[in-house]
Amino acid sequence: MTRGWAIALACGLIGTGAQLAALAPADLAAQTTNTGVSVERLLAAPIITPDLHPSIGENIQGPSVIRVPDWVQNPLGAYYLYFADHKGTYIRLAYADDLLGPWRIHAPGSLQIADSYFLTAPPEVEPERAARLRAQPTNRGHDSFVEATTPHIASPDVHVDDENRRIVMYFHGLDGVSRQVSRVATSSDGIQFEARPEPLGRTYMRALQHDGYTYIMSMPGQFYRSLDPLSGFEEGPRLFNPDMRHAALLKRDETLFVFWTQVGEVPERIYLSTIDISGDWTAWAETPSVEVLRPEFDWEGADAPLEPSVRSTAYGHVNQLRDPAILEDPESGRVFLLYAVAGESGIAIAEVHFDD
């Protein structure tokens, strides 16, 4: 079954002539690495912002896009873009017929926290532990007690399973005081999802199909695999470092391209490493990272102060790029990178170019 998956694939026309012609050369700035990979911004603004609809709020992060499969009846559009509020109670949903927009918001969203098997109310905290949490100093808007007890679901990673005619979403939420884990949900239409109760592993899961297995990498670089994409994941190697944050995966032959960000960077930016996945997964190792994208424009946060990023929510307009997500066009071979801008203030799109 696993080889039938369309992993976050995007196909069809990418932008109208008018949209592309409106871009000045500076807006199409490409950042090139010594790995033969460059990233080119496709628009001079984000594709998702708070102005699109009041329902989505100010915190916008965690994109994942699918091309809606032909077997979905009466789709809202050709593409579904899932995203979240870092501390929100449902997975947001936008739709469009073109990756460059215009994007529209499906205000009810998709998966709701009440249907997720995660906590819907703050957990009880023992008085001594609560006192310790409250005594910790705030850090750029982060209150340790609030961070440890706020129910939410976030970080969707969405895939089309054509063989079983279902759409699969990995996501995470609060399962206890300071405890977050991931679960999975499925849908026949990409809007209404049914979650499964089994915790699968750590947060920020990103899935790929390889040699008959579903492999998952979660934060920070923890790998899992299972013959069943919905259950029974075994824990494998942990790569990268403890400060790794978000990641996106692209498999090409026996090479896994990992686009990722790191907590504490000034500014937080998107890196690229590769992993040779031809051998035993316990021997996998990542290459040294190279930078592929950093904030360069005000709408990406380049006008905000330079300061180290921190874990959890990005409050306000900050000088950070987060949440890389990869889309691959199976017909043209074009590869697209979505990412959160100015911390968690919107979602932008770029194209990834390979020398080969």
List PLM regions with ranges:
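Iron-sulfur (Fe-S) cluster-binding modules
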Residues: 321
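N-terminal secretory signal peptides that target proteins for export/translocation
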Residues: 1-3
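Bacterial N-terminal signal peptides
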Residues: 8-22
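Low-complexity, intrinsically disordered tandem-repeat tracts enriched in small residues
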Residues: 21-29
